[in-house]
Amino acid sequence: MKYVELNLFPEEEEETQKSSDSKWNNKYTSDKGKEYNSDKGNEYSSDESNKYDFTNLFERLSKSAFRSRFHLSQKDREYIAEKGLATIRKHAEDFVTKRLAPAIIPNDGKQTPMRGHPVFIAQHATGCCCRGCFFKWHHIPAGRQLTREEQQYAVAVLMAWIEKHYS
């Protein structure tokens, strides 16, 4: 499998300082209790309780023949190792904002490729690939713009799945 280099993420080209008006909370807590800071790419333990508990969700997803067939390939793992989880999280934020969050998505149900990026794999594995699946698995209705909190939730789901399957 070959990854297509898209210049969708100019922040990878050069390190920039965090702007004070950032729309994202740059920390997330995985289902394993680890916190990640996307500005620094550092992983550190947290005593703080998790904001989300994905145990029930991942249990339900594991019972789906379609959802449970998705796994990270060796190329996906190498890509994550090369870019780092903080960068992968930024990609997830961007994909959620552009492909899942809008109220009207002209190609809804077909907007997420089945391969080519670890986040795409995670989107299909977690039911965050289109608004129909997002409603079915996460009970967040289509036909309206996702709130900032709902977008952060989707990113947290994706990153928890990636971390679980990467380690």
Predicted regions and their residues:
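Short terminal or interdomain "cap/linker" segment that borders an active site or interface and mediates
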Residues: 160-167
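The feature represents the first ordered module of a protein
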Residues: 58-111
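Immediate flanking context of iron-sulfur cluster ligation sites
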Residues: 106-126
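Iron-sulfur (Fe-S) cluster-binding segments and ferredoxin-like electron-carrier domains
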Residues: 132-158
